[in-house]
Amino acid sequence: GGTALGESVRSLLQHDDAGQGMSPEAELLLFAASRAQHVRELIAPAIAQGQIVLCDRFLDSTTVYQGVARAIDSKKVETINQFAIGDTKPDLTILIDLSPEIGLARVHARSDGQLDRMEKEAIEFFQAVRQGYLDLAKSEPKRFLVLDGSQSVEELETQIWQKVEATFT
């Protein structure tokens, strides 16, 4: 998302009937295309102006969802990520960790039965995603802040702001 192209790709990936049966490789390349546009259209210009940029998801999502959970070779994912984002890399990544079972229960509670293509994946997929994120966080501990997602929103907010202020002020 974030750009007109990104929103179109997002719709295709999540809701469009044409996205059903999509190969892992096509999914990877579509996410990379969306991310490349997002970097060039929004992120890079903002950084060039000295702004702080917040993203809901970024290259780690591709590394984990397509590389780990979809079992695409990590070197290929890394190469495609590098091509898509260039030198743009987060200074801080906040990972709110939650068991897939609780996370999916929350998704179901808010969705009225209208799940997107990713949300319909089996629990094993989300277990692989979670482990992939935790492994990534372990490999880059200076960049990642891992928080227990079972805490209250207020507790999470306090911890996040403390880390953001320490990192960017």
Language model segments and positions:
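Short beta->alpha linker loops
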Residues: 1, 34, 58, 98-99, ...
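ATP-dependent small-molecule kinase phosphotransfer cores
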Residues: 1-85
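Residues within well-formed alpha-helices
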Residues: 45, 54, 80, 89, ...
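A generic structural signal for alpha->beta connector loops
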Residues: 50-51, 90, 141-144
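Hydrophobic/aromatic beta-strand patches that form the interior of the parallel beta-sheet core
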Residues: 54, 92-94, 145-147
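A glycine- and Lys/Arg-enriched "phosphate-lid" helix/loop adjacent to the NTP-binding pocket
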Residues: 61-131
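NTP-dependent small-molecule kinase module
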Residues: 101-169
